[in-house]
Amino acid sequence: MAVVKCKPTSPGRRHVVKVVNPELHKGKPYAPLLEKNSKSGGRNNNGRITTRHIGGGHKQQYRLIDFKRNKDGIPAVVERLEYDPNRSANIALVLYKDGERRYILAPKGLKAGDQIQSGVDAAIKAGNTLPMRNIPVGSTVHNVEMKPGKGGQLARSAGTYVQIVARDGSYVTLRLRSGEMRKVESDCRATLGEVGNAEHMLRVLGKAGAARWRGVRPTVRGTAMNPVDHPHGGGEGRNFGKHPVSPWGLQTKGKKTRSNKRTDKFIVRRRTK
């Protein structure tokens, strides 16, 4: 995988930095694992904007990813690695011995021809999925379940991982990339290794149009608006003379947004970033 800086042949190419992976499949994705993925434009069922800065973008099809990895005891061979427009990580098409194909998140170091497996008897190697009670303390894992059988929810983005730091009875303690340490049940599954495509964070789109291809619309500063449009709007010059607030008048810097008090008991240490 290479990080390529484009030559400045035009203003739009001058700052572009691309991540090139020659191992990715250049053909079409596996059709039986595709689904329609309609765009909302950031609107809800009433047509009102619920998420700003979303709209347009290229049409995409959703790839059905196997986050549960519950096909136990049946070995699978990696057929190819693919690009997925719906996530930062790459995905791998795997063929199980019984003939079924599934997409999984491609961990770091996985390549075509490798063999993977799920279940309590799986070997301790990257790409294999086991209950965390069977994974050695100190291991790095990804695609971590928060409830047994629900499917992986933690550490699914490119280059991310979770470290198992302790095992205590029916719970394991995890250290997340944010610095948070939390407990989950030891019967929850995780996939060994870290998610691949870690160079994704180094890419530079280079121009506004590249963001529009991805369905991202411009973000306008509140102080550049009129008073009718934003609490920061209006006035002479750039000063808005008050504490920073959202377009709806709510405190916007440093305000706590976590509301799920029910699971606070599982958080051993709060995140640090």
Curated annotation (Swiss-Prot):
Q: Residue span of the signal peptide, if any? A: none
**Matching Gene3D superfamilies:** 2.30.30.30, Nucleic acid-binding proteins, Ribosomal protein L2, domain 3
Q: Which UniProt keywords apply?
A: Ribonucleoprotein, Ribosomal protein, RNA-binding, rRNA-binding
Q: Which InterPro entries match?
A: NA-bd_OB-fold, Rib_uL2_dom2, Ribosomal_uL2, Ribosomal_uL2_bac/org-type, Ribosomal_uL2_C, Ribosomal_uL2_CS, Ribosomal_uL2_dom3, Ribosomal_uL2_RNA-bd_dom
GO biological process, any: cytoplasmic translation
> Does Ribosomal protein show up as a keyword for this record?
yes
Cellular component terms, GO, for this chain's entry?
large ribosomal subunit
Quaternary structure annotation from Swiss-Prot or TrEMBL: Part of the 50S ribosomal subunit. Forms a bridge to the 30S subunit in the 70S ribosome.
Q: Which PANTHER family match?
A: LARGE RIBOSOMAL SUBUNIT PROTEIN UL2M, RIBOSOMAL PROTEIN L2
Write down the NCBIfam families for this protein, in alphabetical order.
rplB_bact
Outline what the protein does: One of the primary rRNA binding proteins. Required for association of the 30S and 50S subunits to form the 70S ribosome, for tRNA binding and peptide bond formation. It has been suggested to have peptidyltransferase activity; this is somewhat controversial. Makes several contacts with the 16S rRNA in the 70S ribosome.
Q: This chain belongs to which protein, by name?
A: Large ribosomal subunit protein uL2
Species whose genome carries this gene: Pectobacterium carotovorum subsp. carotovorum (strain PC1)
Q: What is the lineage of its organism?
A: Bacteria, Pseudomonadati, Pseudomonadota, Gammaproteobacteria, Enterobacterales
